[in-house]
Amino acid sequence: MGRIVMKFGGTSVADLERIRAVSALVAKEVDAGHEVAVVVSAMSGETNRLVSLVDALDADCPPGEDKCGGDIHDEYDSIVASGEQVTSGLLAIAMRRRGIRARSWLGWQIPLRTDMAHSKARIAEIESSAIGPSLADGNVAVVAGFQGISDDGRISTLGRGGSDTSAVALAIALKADRCDIYTDVDGIYTTDPRIVPEARRLNRIAFEEMLELASLGAKVLQVRSVELAMNYNLPIRVLTSMAVEGQDNPGTLVCHEDQTMEERVVSGVAYSRDEAQITLLRLSDKPGMVAKVCKAMSDANVIVDMIVQGISRSDNAANLTFTVGERDLDIALAALEAAQEEIGFKAIKHDRDVTKVSVVGIGMRSHTGVAQTMFEALAERGINIEVIATSEIKISVLIDSEYTELAVRALHNAFDLHETKAPPVTAP
Amino acid sequence: MGRIVMKFGGTSVADLERIRAVSALVAKEVDAGHEVAVVVSAMSGETNRLVSLVDALDADCPPGEDKCGGDIHDEYDSIVASGEQVTSGLLAIAMRRRGIRARSWLGWQIPLRTDMAHSKARIAEIESSAIGPSLADGNVAVVAGFQGISDDGRISTLGRGGSDTSAVALAIALKADRCDIYTDVDGIYTTDPRIVPEARRLNRIAFEEMLELASLGAKVLQVRSVELAMNYNLPIRVLTSMAVEGQDNPGTLVCHEDQTMEERVVSGVAYSRDEAQITLLRLSDKPGMVAKVCKAMSDANVIVDMIVQGISRSDNAANLTFTVGERDLDIALAALEAAQEEIGFKAIKHDRDVTKVSVVGIGMRSHTGVAQTMFEALAERGINIEVIATSEIKISVLIDSEYTELAVRALHNAFDLHETKAPPVTAP
């Protein structure tokens, strides 16, 4: 008996049948004597439908007058958050019709307070003084994920995948014993099984590895949810909501490194196509120039990822290459053009057709030779590397998008990820 | 220059094209120097879509266990209110893209406070301390209609058509000069033009008449919106949102009787198929018996309409016949069965296939002979009258539903409603 948070993504609540199936999974935990808070996403496809409505109107500017009436992220949030509002109410009804007391909670009702960065807000605080007693009183709390309330009393949203972060933050605020993330896959894999059919489900993975994988494009968990869980040492279990009754569904436990137990150098290969490469040509060679670029990007709310400074062979001037999320490219380019004088560069080049491929593993800390294996595997297939970035536990390369599948397969093979290196460990 | 409230129903915001058209109508008023609050309904079809999701889950009770987990109106409200949330955000974006400052306001953000009768809540108070200054500051307020917040901090809704009431109440709270209700018809007609093609648009109609027509099934305005407007003497203009550019769109002005100016005895013929007839057989003949029936209905939140007490020819016992809204019939029957001993009756009969047909007119106050004309017209067509109810300005009869069109045409003709009795009056 304890307090648990369960989170169900869009495909898990895609229609009434799925919502009923979710209510059965929740009922099982309630019957086991747990206090349960459930975090739900919008029904699959609903967020896209709403976003497409917003985008169509957003584009209604007279020619040449970009964003004529200003930012619309506040209204985007109010519109898109309605998707989770619907699902939370529906699941609350489904729970009641099983005879289980339940009520929905919207972000502003909890309240889950965020900063003012509409459409990519960050959680500032979750009030537990209303929802906590309601749980203790035997009510299932069905929480609309992805949403909160900003200081001006408007609805805010946490960005795509934000429901994971809602769930983890709620679990921390409610001092829950664990957070189970139900999704449409049965755990975290060594790589995308659509590209490498031999990819293997991991029984456990360290927070740090999951963080890198999530940052690198493995879309199972939102990056910030993993950061949060790591900071508070909250174990997350990733498992499928589609398990057949009676069938084992251990999922993957994302937990502290000491608990992972499996010995391996590389845990997984990730890739992200949502990348764009920007190169600033012939930069003025003054101190603080990179800081100015980063400030311009940060002011525009654009996250800069891989950064490389180099010397152009043709004119011996300094160039700066970095990557941003592909959907931020236009904003980034506009911000850089506006700051061209301030930063001091001659021209901008950009490329949307790039993919970041990465190998990740806690074991890289104490093993050498990973980079060499990686670069050799890519070179053997004639794949050219544009940019390299490394951290303690990962190596990322930026390559031409058309080599994506080839690169992922080559690396999965080079690090023998299809083979189990340790006996499977059962999740608790 | 003044302050106006404009309200757009579901068909007026049915898709992005219509929302853009609405933004043009709003822009016109802004350009004329007005402060404008716009109240919007959900996109046409959206409320039905959401209600059907709710209904499907609501029906998930084990056989024999009706409403096993209790009332779900609170969750219904939270789910269905999302429709207006989306439209308000979309129209705010459309306004901004015309270069006009605008923001959406949800019921809880204003706040528009209601009682706790979820799914048919009544407005208790509209706070104008936030929205008023925002308007005065030059922002268009795009208000999600139909919704408010109840004392427990949950979303409440005002019942079908509630956006009209939102608009009128907001106009009163904001001390607006007028309230324009844009809809898919170009005004109030003498009767339903689908049944009587010769039906005529009225230039003006008295609050009292509109109130009867609205109560009687003319679906252009919600009853409570008319009551409110009458109590505060706020003129409502009903006009179409589909007018062709440059074409006259006077609509119908709903206003104080003295301002109607058109002389006529009967203004319109209304009908409502959303009726069900209940008869309690062999009632115990004790004082307060009807009061007990009314209390049972009121406790179940069911509105009782026409009431007739009679003596059964067969056994000389007292019977009580009354009508309720068809969608309340099951609730009403359940409540009556539960109170059978308390009220004291032998059996219940009910009939769903009944229609209420009514003639309405301020002039009936000072003219006799209306009832005679009405009953003769129906008798000539062999239409049997089940129940009769009258007020100062209307006569209603309950008939078998299959005679609905025949009865409406007969009455429209009997009162010469296709002829203009006074020269048309132009709305201000």
Model feature map: region roles:
Chain A
Residues 32, 98, 232, 300, ...:
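Conserved dinucleotide-binding and phosphotransfer motif residues
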Residues 40-51, 238-259, 322:
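Terminal amphipathic helices with adjacent charged low-complexity linkers/tails
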Residues 1-226, 399-400, 415, 419, ...:
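Nucleotide/pyrophosphate-binding catalytic subdomain
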Residues 222, 233-240:
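Acidic/polar loop patches that form or flank catalytic/metal-binding clefts of enzymes
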Residues 10, 44-45, 147-148, 242, ...:
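Active-site-proximal loop/turn and secondary-structure-junction residues that shape catalytic pockets
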Residues 246-428:
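A conserved regulatory-domain signal marking ACT and ACT-like small-molecule sensing domains
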